[in-house]
Regions:
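Positively charged n-region of N-terminal signal peptides that target proteins for export
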Residues: 1-4
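N-terminal signal peptide c-region/cleavage motif recognized by signal peptidases
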Residues: 14-17
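Short, glycine-/small- and polar/acidic-enriched structural segments
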Residues: 21-151, 158-169
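A bilobed periplasmic-binding-protein/Venus flytrap-type ligand-binding module shared by bacterial periplasmic
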Residues: 41-42, 105-115, 198-214, 267
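N-terminal secretory/targeting leader peptides
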Residues: 50-53, 183, 245, 271
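Pocket-lining segment of extracytoplasmic ligand-binding domains
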Residues: 81-82, 152-248
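Secondary-structure end/capping motifs
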Residues: 211-291
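Conserved C-terminal helix/tail region of periplasmic/extracytoplasmic solute-binding proteins
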Residues: 279-312
């Protein structure tokens, strides 16, 4: 009897030692195509018994950086400028894996309304996420001081009925959604105006210090899953479309093709890599509009050590 009890105890200990570690990656929005690689990592849990990756959707009322900083989730997806803004307030976060070379912010407007450059948008109504950093920089850089800002609610009908209005969106999705509804549109991407924050997965300094092997495992898994989701996009596409009411297969497929053309490195093994100079560039732009203090150090907001093969 004692031997049986000892065996059960030993098995229990082994279960504890080799238990799968579960980590949550909080997205910056509802499920959409640019998150495909993350969802692929969740699908691939069946092939791994060490770390289980759970993808949690974000949304307009979810503060990703705050939740990661508080320890509610282990990892989050957000723009690199948002990571630095949070760090300027003491969050102690670090970007570890870049999933898009720049956040696809865009300004969508009606054609044939006298817009030949971004400066022609001055004085018009603008549906925007109030307080978003990129717009503070664009507004100052291009002297757009008469724009009539109002909170973005995603109402495409209002845009369709208001020829002078322009609207914030993602270049991967908004123009195609308007096309699908028969609403003529043109766009000026924020990246083309010179503001290019990364879309980056981040975690806490604390987790990096206490469990670097876990962080490394997540980055390694993502490097594989992003490549896999591009080679065979159907599983993640089917899942994302099952969760989305605003995007159809054509819009989703178009977004993936745009990502390949303009948002991902030609060498997919480099997906995840980040250039320190890009963090400095965006930090300097944020300082220009007094979003960051002059002495803020952007090098404390990223860690390039986990994504291998970036600097060969």
């Amino acid at each position: 009897m004692k031997k049986i009890i000892a065996l059960i105890a030993a098995l229990g200990l082994a279960t504890t030692v080799f238990a799968t570690r579960e980590v949550t990656l909080l997205m910056d929005w509802f499920p959409q195509g640019n998150q495909s690689g993350y969802f692929q990592a969740q699908f691939d849990n069946q092939y791994h018994d060490d770390v289980k990756i759970i993808i949690k959707s974000g949304g307009p009322k979810i503060n990703t950086t705050a939740q990661v900083a508080a320890g509610s989730v282990e990892f989050g997806l957000q723009a690199s400028d948002s990571v630095m803004l949070a760090n300027s307030k003491g969050a102690k976060l670090k970007g570890i894996f870049v999933s898009l070379n720049h956040v696809p912010y865009t300004l969508v407007y009606h054609p044939n309304t006298g817009v030949n450059s971004v400066k022609d948008l001055d004085g018009r109504p603008f549906a925007v996420k109030i307080g978003v950093t990129y717009w503070k920089w664009v507004k100052q850089k291009y002297g757009l001081n008469k724009v009539k800002e109002f909170p973005l609610k995603g109402d495409l009908g209002l845009f369709a009925r208001t020829p002078q209005q322009f609207q914030q969106g993602y270049s991967l999705f908004l123009p195609a959604r308007l096309d699908a509804k028969g609403v003529p549109n043109e766009q000026i991407t924020v990246e083309s105006l010179g503001y290019r924050p990364y879309s980056v997965l981040f975690t806490t300094d604390k987790l990096i210090k206490e469990d670097p092997e876990l962080v490394q495992t997540v980055v390694d898994r993502l490097s594989i899953s992003f490549h896999k989701s591009l080679v065979d996009p159907k599983p993640t596409r089917d899942f994302i479309l099952s969760k989305s009411k605003k995007v159809n297969a054509e819009i989703h497929n178009n977004a993936i093709e745009l990502m390949k053309q303009d948002f991902l490195p030609a060498d997919w093994s480099k997906i995840g890599c980040q250039d320190p100079n890009r963090w400095v560039e965006v930090a300097n732009q944020m300082k220009e509009v007094n979003v960051l203090p002059a002495d803020f150090d952007p090098h404390q907001s990223y860690d390039t050590s986990f994504k291998k093969g970036c600097f060969k």
